[in-house]
Amino acid sequence: MKKKKEKEKEKQKSINYYIFFFQYTLVYNTIQINKIYKLFYHVFITKKKNYFSKSNYNSPPKSVFSSGRENVYLPEEYKKKIEKENQENLEILENSMKDASHSKTTSLPFSSSSPQSSSSSSSSSSSSNSSLSCSLIFSSTLSLIKSELIKDDTIKYSESDSKSDSEFDSESNSDFDSESESEYEYEYEYESKSNSEQPIINNYLDHTYIYNFAIVVKAIHYLHHFIKEMLKFV
């Protein structure tokens, strides 16, 4: 009886550890991918004016690359709300880490597993707890990912960047004839005006198929590893 209980305890410890490992690594890699996405966005998307002016409009239309986010900003109240939610989620992760390090038999805060009542139902309860943990792990993970993605939802530009862009545009536009130059200025003014009137954009994945693909690949990789480790205890 004691040996069975000890084995069940060891199983629960390992299950709790792998649940925490899966959630933590998925969130961490999501944050890293988000940073790479911001760099990609800033280098390739925000510099579209320079590319179009050099190529003399022999390129796809601007609407394909328009993000609609150049003049969009988040209010302070919304930022505080996101930071608060993010802090709460990080506290959940820290508490989970402490539980795993102290080797407690209780489940993680987001696993909602019940304690084992008797030795006869120990195996069935442990399997049900693991399945509940597997199914409910995604809700807290997705909330953490969402808070990280929306925490800094806009790309902020420094004055020096905007100045250099305008200087480059003025130099490159000198190569155009007067008609194409006036057309370019009119279209850019209209686009910036329409962007400033747009509401706050919370969907961070508006036109980034690369970002979506990277998230899916990472999620599948860690989910496969997580399931493979969990099957050892079944």
UniProtKB/Swiss-Prot annotation:
Q: Where are the transmembrane segments?
A: 13-32
Q: How does it sit in the membrane?
A: Single-pass membrane protein
Q: Which GO terms describe its cellular component?
A: membrane
Going by the UniProt record, its keywords in alphabetical order are: Membrane, Transmembrane, Transmembrane helix
Q: Where is this region: Disordered?
A: 102-130, 159-185
| Keyword Transmembrane included in the entry's annotation | yes
* This protein's record includes keyword Aminoacyl-tRNA synthetase: no
**Stretches with biased composition (Acidic residues):** 167-185
Q: Which domain of life is it from?
A: Eukaryota
Q: Can you say where in the cell this protein is located?
A: Membrane
Ranges annotated as biased composition (Low complexity) = 103-130
Name by which UniProt lists this protein: Putative uncharacterized transmembrane protein DDB_G0281883
